[in-house]
Amino acid sequence: MEPTEYRDELRSVLDTASGVVSDRLAAIHNAATPRTEGIVIDVSLDQDGEGTFGVWARYEGPDAFSLNQQIGDERELFGVIWGEEGWEPPVPHRPRKWSRVELEKVVVGVVAKWIDGLIPSTATELPWEVTTPDGTVDAVLVGPEISRGHSPR
């Protein structure tokens, strides 16, 4: 499988969850307080890089802990698990020649493009970024202000 094919197939699977994720992002945005410093979308791949991953939203700032607790499991935006018949949902398999690092970069990039279009257009007061929890991939700024060419800060 070529990188472009992998990206396209992954994006088509992500798109099936867009309605639910858009609603969750709106709820996350609406729950933010004046002390919220930003919203981070974490993409977590499994340690062996076989293909399972999760996409979670979290707050940054002094109120982060209480806000994250308030939203709870609704912070999970997307998840891939190994089921009885393979990946659930059926994301493409990692190309054999890719390392875990390569897979992680591609998944973060595809998720960032997908999430960018789902963030509420009114969410201009906060920075939004897509990254990995351990910071191994550079953060990608997303959201309505970024789409218009300027940073919210």
What is the meaning of each model-derived region?
Residues 64-127:
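Amphipathic protein-protein interaction modules
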Residues 1-12, 32, 101-153:
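Acidic, proline/glycine-rich low-complexity IDRs
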Residues 21, 41, 57, 128-130:
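Generic structural hydrophobic/aromatic packing signal, biased to beta-strands
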Residues 58-64, 76, 147-150:
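Short, low-complexity, polar/charged sequence segments that are solvent-exposed and flexible
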Residues 1-37, 45:
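N-terminal domain-onset segments
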Residues 27-68:
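Amphipathic, interaction-prone secondary-structure segments
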